[in-house]
Amino acid sequence: MRKILFFGLLSICFLFVFFFYKQKENKIIYNKIVEKFEDNVVIDETYTHLFKDSNLKELVFIKSRLIIPELEHKKMMKATGYRADAYRALSTVYKFDFKVHDNKILGFKSVIFEGFEDAKVSKHENNLPSEKWQQLKDFNIGDPNINEKFFHLEFPFVVKNTLCVTISKGFFKKIKKLKRLKIMLISNEDREYKIDIENFLPKYNL
């Protein structure tokens, strides 16, 4: 009788731990912002995954869509020229924001998505508009040395660093097929920040 009771309680504990782990892993904070200016609309959808056990505090996936009615017309979508090309490239933007807390200002020289180690990475500044955005292959991590003159400083407070990684629509479709998101960030100090979470991207209409 005692053995049955013991194994029964043990099973309940395992189920509770598993349920708690799944709840923790699947905790995604969703937010949607719609802004209008004149006849144009900007829609930002964010999906935030929180971490508790490391300096890497948040992974935020952002889908931004710009809707300009006059350029949504079929004829305009087939048009050529800088304005039409830029709109096609930028009408929908996908990006990850990685938020890392430290007592220093950090730069990130490399981002690796497991399974796509040979991805084509660009490192230009996140300035818009730019012809470089139209040439985005897989993803862009920005200039890792843009704050290089501050790297040696240490502060008596928490510095909230944000690495913005913009990904192409084609690369987004590839990582959306993964079962898990396994991503490694490498800082200017060669410190590694690893992510291994359930891939939440297929669950949403993105």
UniProtKB/Swiss-Prot annotation:
Domain of life: Bacteria
Subcellular location, record wording: Cell outer membrane
A Gene Ontology cellular-component term: cell outer membrane
This protein's UniProt keywords: Cell outer membrane, Membrane, Plasmid, Signal, Virulence
Paired cysteines (S-S): none
Signal sequence range: 1-19
Pfam families: BPTA
Primary location class: membrane
Record bears the keyword Signal: yes
Entries under InterPro entries matching the protein: BptA
Record function comment: Virulence-associated protein essential for survival of the bacterium within the tick host and therefore within the natural life cycle of the spirochete.
Family: Belongs to the BptA family.
Protein's name in the database: Protein BptA
Organism of provenance: Borrelia bissettiae (strain DSM 17990 / CIP 109136 / DN127)
Gene that this polypeptide is encoded by: bptA
